[in-house]
C-alpha cells in the first residue's frame, strides 16, 4: 500500500510503502470494541462507595416493641428503608479492569490503523518539528492539511515546540509513538503519523 507523504505546510515529500500486514487488514469491529472496553475499564478509578447500614451514624436501639403495635417489625434506624439509613447493595471500591490477551491487543492496534487507512483518514507527514510554539501558526498549518479532529503520532519524542503549540487546540491530540493506542485513534477523525512513527510501528510488529 503506497501513501503520499506530506509536509506540515501541505507540500509533497515523496511517498511511502506501508506494510499490508499492519495497515491493510479488514477492520473487525468486535476486536476494536473489546480493546476500547479494555482500555476504558482499566482507566476507571473504582473509588465509588456508599455507606451501608453498619457505616451510617444511627442508633441501633429497637424503635419500638416487637409485638402489639400493628406496625412492621423494625430493629434499627439504620435499615435501608428509613431516611438516613444505610444503602443496601450499593457500589463498593473495586478494580474494574479485566484481562485481554496480548495478541488480541496487538491485533486491535493493527485493525485500528487499518481502519484509518481504509477510510482514507490516515496522513503521513515527514516530520513535526517547528521553529515556533505559537498556536496561531499551528492552526494555520492544520487548516492547510484539513485537520479539525486528529491524533498526531510523533517519533520516540515529540518536538517541544510542536507539543506546546498543539496542546491548546481542541480535538487535537499529540502522542509519542510508544503512546499510540486504539481508543485515541478511534476517537479522532484523522490519524497523522510521522515517517519515524511508521518505521517504529513496522519495527514493533516485525
Swiss-Prot record:
Indicate the family of this protein. Answer: Belongs to the universal ribosomal protein uL4 family.
Q: Which domain of life is it from?
A: Bacteria
Which SUPFAM superfamilies does UniProt cross-reference here?
A: Ribosomal protein L4
Q: Does the keyword Ribonucleoprotein apply?
A: yes
Can you name this protein? Answer: Large ribosomal subunit protein uL4
List the keywords (alphabetical): Ribonucleoprotein, Ribosomal protein, RNA-binding, rRNA-binding
Pfam families referenced in this protein's UniProt entry, alphabetically: Ribosomal_L4
Report the protein's function.
One of the primary rRNA binding proteins, this protein initially binds near the 5'-end of the 23S rRNA. It is important during the early stages of 50S assembly. It makes multiple contacts with different domains of the 23S rRNA in the assembled 50S subunit and ribosome. Forms part of the polypeptide exit tunnel.
Q: Which residues form a coiled coil?
A: none
Biological-process GO terms, alphabetical: translation
Q: Which organism is it from?
A: Methylorubrum populi (strain ATCC BAA-705 / NCIMB 13946 / BJ001) (Methylobacterium populi)
A GO molecular-function annotation: structural constituent of ribosome
Gene Ontology cellular-component terms for this entry are:
ribonucleoprotein complex; ribosome
Q: How does it assemble?
A: Part of the 50S ribosomal subunit.
Upper taxonomic lineage: Bacteria, Pseudomonadati, Pseudomonadota, Alphaproteobacteria, Hyphomicrobiales
